[in-house]
């Protein structure tokens, strides 16, 4: 008889193994599976494990040349999702050998590469994954991390303040630099290129870099504080991106930026390596994330993209606000905020954390709260995000009736007032508006901002 039995067979015979004990070296994934009508959950979960590891749709004779038991993904647990009809969380374990070291790109190609178009599934979402410590150690991670950044900038004991320069498209380089200078002069720590400011006909990248560097140094000289502007190095090719990073380094600026999802993980990891080698901080914007993470039942949760970014490398990453114009539930957001900045995060399903994650001292990433926030949100933001964060007010700075610099002053005064109140033991959640009102008595800039945006 032939060595193998040809034909299509049920995945669950090979890939559903409820008795499997997960290894410390396994990569674990939690998928939200919505099977097609009539497909049992075990078969759907096994199909995910198979298609994202060694499986193919039929038995092949070359299976005999390898050890499936060593290399196959295994669906080791399935649980129904409370309150949802025909939705399950399928837990899959992947042997470490399936993944190339230090490659977020390969990790994603394996885990989420093919399986999302699978016919037996109506929808599939990767909710969380556990990166084993052995695999974490193959990545450089963030170029510098939270502590090194504070030391470079000499800023301690408070969140950092930023502002995206608007209008995002159409300013000339010189006017853009002027807006940067005014914000930094007023008291912000950072200003930011918008994510879609790359190198367009109305403002080429080199001109922008030059005028922004000039703005930085002028503001630094006048305030005695270290200032930064996130120079967006995102480009059409990796070579061009590195060229921009090199020019930023030659100007001596402290920080550059990258759009990591549109730019891609390979480009991002290269840039992160360059940044560590050359003392540049790296700010990461998440343009395109909602394409991947907005649907509740299909795609990937942002916490997965955030963990991947920590492996690939970035010192700041945008993470929603909990308040403001973009959606984000508080506990869930705080869950992935801790995932990117803490060293050990315990499993906690109420915060959306499916696995305990040990980062074995990989540097942390500062979460960036940005999008529709203004001075009245400051107490809540300070309380929710704590000191290790960057609070970014675009319109909330530039929309000030007296101009950019007074807008920056208003934000800085509000922040310092909240930090002081917190340090004095006051309850920011309860007394927030009162704290801002008190501070505005001493700051006409803040008082004007309080008028424009009502609490």
UniProtKB/Swiss-Prot annotation:
E.C. number(s) listed in UniProt: 4.1.1.39
Domain of life per record: Eukaryota
Binding site for substrate: 114, 164, 168, 286, 318, 370
Alphabetical GO biological process terms: photorespiration; reductive pentose-phosphate cycle
Binding site for Mg(2+): 192, 194-195
One MF term in the entry's GO annotations: monooxygenase activity
Catalytic activity: 2 (2R)-3-phosphoglycerate + 2 H(+) = D-ribulose 1,5-bisphosphate + CO2 + H2O; D-ribulose 1,5-bisphosphate + O2 = 2-phosphoglycolate + (2R)-3-phosphoglycerate + 2 H(+)
Keywords associated with the record: Calvin cycle, Carbon dioxide fixation, Chloroplast, Disulfide bond, Lyase, Magnesium, Metal-binding, Methylation, Monooxygenase, Oxidoreductase, Photorespiration, Photosynthesis, Plastid
Modifications the protein undergoes after translation, according to the UniProt entry: The disulfide bond which can form in the large chain dimeric partners within the hexadecamer appears to be associated with oxidative stress and protein turnover.
Gene Ontology, cellular component aspect: chloroplast
Entry-linked Pfam families: RuBisCO_large, RuBisCO_large_N
Active site: 166, 285
Residues bearing the modification N6-carboxylysine: 192
Enzyme class (EC, first level): lyase
List of residues that carry N6,N6,N6-trimethyllysine: 5
Manner of cofactor binding, per the entry note: Binds 1 Mg(2+) ion per subunit.
Record InterPro entries: RuBisCO (IPR033966), RuBisCo_large_chain_AS (IPR020878), RuBisCO_lsu_C (IPR000685), RuBisCO_lsu_C_sf (IPR036376), RuBisCO_lsu_fd_N (IPR017443), RuBisCO_lsu_N_sf (IPR036422), RuBisCO_lsuI (IPR020888)
Subunit structure: Heterohexadecamer of 8 large chains and 8 small chains; disulfide-linked. The disulfide link is formed within the large subunit homodimers.
Note: The basic functional RuBisCO is composed of a large chain homodimer in a 'head-to-tail' conformation. In form I RuBisCO this homodimer is arranged in a barrel-like tetramer with the small subunits forming a tetrameric 'cap' on each end of the 'barrel'.
Name of the protein in question: Ribulose bisphosphate carboxylase large chain
Primary gene name: rbcL
């Amino acid at each position: 008889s032939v060595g193998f039995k040809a034909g299509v067979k049920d995945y669950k015979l090979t890939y559903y193994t409820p008795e499997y004990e997960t290894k410390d070296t396994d990569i674990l994934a939690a998928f939200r599976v919505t099977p097609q009508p009539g497909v049992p959950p075990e078969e759907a979960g096994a199909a995910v494990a198979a298609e994202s590891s060694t499986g193919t749709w039929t038995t092949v004779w070359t299976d005999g040349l390898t050890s499936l038991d060593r290399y196959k993904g295994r669906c080791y647990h399935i649980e129904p999702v409370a309150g949802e009809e025909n939705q399950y969380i399928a837990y899959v374990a992947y042997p470490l050998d399936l993944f190339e070291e230090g490659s977020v790109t390969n990790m994603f190609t394996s885990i989420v590469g093919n399986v999302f178009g699978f016919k037996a599934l109506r929808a599939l979402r990767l909710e969380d994954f556990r990166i084993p410590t052995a695999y974490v150690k193959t990545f450089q991670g963030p170029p510098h991390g939270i502590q090194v950044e504070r030391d470079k900038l000499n800023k301690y004991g408070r969140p950092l303040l930023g502002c995206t320069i608007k209008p995002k498209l159409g300013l000339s380089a010189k006017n853009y630099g002027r807006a940067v200078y005014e914000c930094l002069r007023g008291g912000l720590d950072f200003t930011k290129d918008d994510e879609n400011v790359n190198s367009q006909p109305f403002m080429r990248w080199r001109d922008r870099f030059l005028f922004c560097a000039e703005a930085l140094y002028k503001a630094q000289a006048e305030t005695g504080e270290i200032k930064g502007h996130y120079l967006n190095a995102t480009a059409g090719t990796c070579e061009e991106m590195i060229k921009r990073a090199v020019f930023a380094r030659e100007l001596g600026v402290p920080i550059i930026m990258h759009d990591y999802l549109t730019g891609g993980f390979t480009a991002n990891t290269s840039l992160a390596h360059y940044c560590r080698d050359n003392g540049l901080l790296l700010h990461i914007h998440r343009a395109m994330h909602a394409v991947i993470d907005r649907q509740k039942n299909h795609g990937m949760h942002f916490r997965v993209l955030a963990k991947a970014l920590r492996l690939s490398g970035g010192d700041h990453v945008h993470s929603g606000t909990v308040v403001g114009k973009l959606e984000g539930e508080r506990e869930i957001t705080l869950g992935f905020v801790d995932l990117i900045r803490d060293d050990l995060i315990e499993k906690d399903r109420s915060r959306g954390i499916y696995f305990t994650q040990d980062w074995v001292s990989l540097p942390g990433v500062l979460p960036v709260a940005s999008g529709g926030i203004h001075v009245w949100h400051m107490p809540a933001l300070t309380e929710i995000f704590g000191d290790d964060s960057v609070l970014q007010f675009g319109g909330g700075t530039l929309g000030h009736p007296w101009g950019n610099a007074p807008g920056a002053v208003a934000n800085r005064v509000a922040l310092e007032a909240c930090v002081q109140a917190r340090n004095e033991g006051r309850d920011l959640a309860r007394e927030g508006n009162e704290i801002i009102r008190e501070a505005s008595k001493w700051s006409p800039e803040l008082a004007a901002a309080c008028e424009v945006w009502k609490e």
